[in-house]
A protein has these predicted regions:
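OB-fold (S1/OB) nucleic-acid-binding surfaces
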Residues: 54-93, 183-216
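Secretome/extracellular-domain signature
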Residues: 84-156
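Secreted, disulfide-rich extracellular signaling modules
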Residues: 4-22, 30-34, 76-98, 116-120, ...
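Acidic/polar, low-complexity intrinsically disordered N-terminal segments immediately downstream
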Residues: 1-72, 143-147
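Flexible glycine-rich surface loops and low-complexity tracts that mediate binding to linear polymers
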Residues: 103-124, 168-175, 230-245
């Protein structure tokens, strides 16, 4: 294409050619066409930006699997983070090779390189995990605050697969059994015998929707003597899949009354 610009006398003067370059962030979820699958991204130019919604030093980020009937792998929690898109439209579970590699601070805006990273898609519900990351995959990290998050407020029944691995505020929910502690089990099953690594607590709303809030056995506020919050309110957390189609991971202790 040849461009011409008008001169001072109205004549047209040929302009030097120039290139307009537009960059955009790709949706790497589209790399997997089937209902489920896995692909290794080998592209030095592959990256995405998002906001960290988990906390690297928090004990209630990922359910810790039982590697044997009486053994729990606690390293999984420390190696896991959740990063959602800047607009909150969807998110990834991010699994680092080691806890030392996971330096993602809550609310920070990050740019993550996907070169050499494995993308896994799982179905029913549809969700995505990025694994095999090291500290070197973190291109940049800028501190942020809770106000940087796009607020997504929904009822339990309005949740969809797109909400998985994003931060959502659930309206007018309450605990079905708000008595005792968050983990009403024998503590001996936790640290001594390692039979139990996580306890779900049921939340429900006025529309009959239910969802489990997951509490790991290393969570400091699981049993601190102050009991559980009673009454209806808004509870915020990360939507995940664990046994049930959708569950909620709460990073900090729910406030009393139940508003956060």
């Amino acid at each position: 294409i040849v461009f011409s610009l008008p001169g001072t006398a109205g004549e047209l003067t040929p302009a030097a050619p120039f290139i307009v370059e537009q960059t955009y962030e790709a949706d790497y979820r589209t790399l997997i066409k089937g209902e489920s699958g896995q692909v290794v991204i080998n592209n030095p130019e592959a990256w995405f930006e998002g906001i960290v919604i988990s906390d690297k030093d928090n004990a209630n980020v990922e359910t810790t699997p039982n590697s044997a009937p009486n053994a729990t792998d606690y390293t999984v929690n420390a190696k896991t983070a959740y990063v959602q898109m800047l607009d909150g439209s969807y998110g990834y579970r991010v699994q680092f090779n080691s806890a030392a590699d996971n330096t993602l601070e809550r609310y920070s805006q990050v740019k993550i390189s996907l070169n050499g990273v494995t993308l896994t898609k799982e179905a029913d519900p549809e969700r995505y995990t990025l694994s095999g990351l090291t500290a070197g995959n973190i291109v940049s990290q800028t501190p942020g605050t809770a106000s940087d998050l796009i607020r997504k407020e929904k009822s339990i029944g309005q949740l969809t697969d797109e909400d998985i691995h994003t931060y959502v505020s659930l309206r007018e929910v309450e605990f079905a059994l708000p008595d005792g502690s968050y983990t009403n089990v024998n503590e001996g099953y936790f640290g001594t015998s390692n039979f139990v690594s996580c306890v779900p607590r049921t939340l429900y709303d006025k529309n009959g929707g239910t969802i489990s809030m997951l509490v790991n056995n290393k969570t400091p506020w699981r049993r601190d003597g102050s009991g559980m919050p009673k009454g209806k309110g808004t509870l915020s957390g990360i939507i995940v899949h664990d046994l049930q189609p959708l569950s909620l991971i709460h990073i900090s202790e729910p406030t009393r009354p139940l508003y956060i």
